[in-house]
């Protein structure tokens, strides 16, 4: 059950935003083997001057299509992470027109005790999930 948080520069139309979210979800399902109905996505839109993303030495020129994606998830093997990064970059470029140089991804790992879906319980620990 990965939680995806998207930080975007404001101004995308609803159709483009929906496509971005759908593509990201389909990649999570494929790369991380999660069920199709496990969809947890949050979008934060910011004025352009509120996202200061400078060059990390790779020579990229970022555009207003910038996507900064934070994924909170249980630990996964490096191969699955690499597959996720690759598929996401490929599909966002081919299906959404977002250059792979406009994609930044960070994965933060946690454990079953770190999730509660309500009722004051950690459902992964209680066996309800």
Swiss-Prot record:
EC number: 5.3.2.-
Alphabetic keyword roster: Isomerase
Keyword Nucleotide-binding: no
Protein name as annotated: Probable tautomerase YrdN
A Pfam family the protein falls into: Tautomerase_2
Keyword Glycoprotein: no
Active site: 2
InterPro entries for this protein: Tauto_MSAD, Tautomerase/MIF_sf
Enzyme class: isomerase
Similarity remark: Belongs to the 4-oxalocrotonate tautomerase family.
Described purpose of this protein according to its UniProt entry: Putative target of GltR.
GO molecular function: isomerase activity
